[in-house]
Amino acid sequence: IMNQLQHSKKIARKLRAHRIFGGIKPLALKTRSLRSRIMPAPIPEILILPLLQHQGSPAAEIVNVGDQVLKYQLLAAGESALSVPVHAPTSGKIAAITDTPVPGHDEQSQRCIHLRTDGVDEAIDLLPLPDHRALSHWQLLERVNAAGICGLGGAGFPTTEKLRSGIERGIELLIINAAECEPYISADEALIRERAAAVVSGAEILQSICLADRCVIAIEQNKYDAVNQLRHFLESSS
């Protein structure tokens, strides 16, 4: 990836971006949100897990009220291409499976699993992936689907379908969007600052799935700490 970044810098020098006149350029107000490190959120007594957390059809529950479940255990299976599975965020007991009001959804309520947490946070053993290069891109795609990953944008498309369309169309350049134009949101910058190795590893896995020739991490110039962390990791691992 280091060689690809250097190659992309040479290309960028040859390209001249045209200014867009007008519009709004708000101040970056991220100082407060970046003062502390990434911390785990406290586990509440009840977790409400919608079965439709994505664009498409809802997942179908495979657990029953009263079942004791472990962290990462599959609770609802995706039954179509536009459906992703739902897993337990922590251990506990299934308290209810019922229609529940959900913010930001077109309908007033949707089917949800209510998980009463036990505070133990006991987890199942996850299937390790020591070297993603040992798997084909289709096998990696299946791992992404089984993990229940979907986009965090407004549409919430299943990540598997995004990647599948890229494979079918053919991709030369994979762009990892780490640019944050919103004045306060700082999740991308915080993630890169603290976990640059994981970001690069994830980019390499996506590149293997998409069969892309090159990969570029797009990040704004004012994200100095994040850029330095990426450079340090790439230079030390090359």
Q: What does each model-identified segment do?
A:
Residues 64-77, 96:
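Short, well-structured beta-strand-loop connectors
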Residues 2-62, 114:
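N-terminal, Lys/Arg-enriched amphipathic/low-complexity engagement segments
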Residues 8-11, 77-83:
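Short boundary/loop segments of OB/S1/cold-shock single-stranded nucleic-acid-binding domains
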Residues 38-46, 63-70, 169, 174-179, ...:
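N-terminal glycine-rich anion-binding loops that anchor highly charged ligand groups
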Residues 82-238:
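Iron-sulfur-associated redox domains of electron-transfer enzymes in respiratory
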Residues 59, 65, 82-85:
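Short, conserved secondary-structure segments in the cores of folded domains
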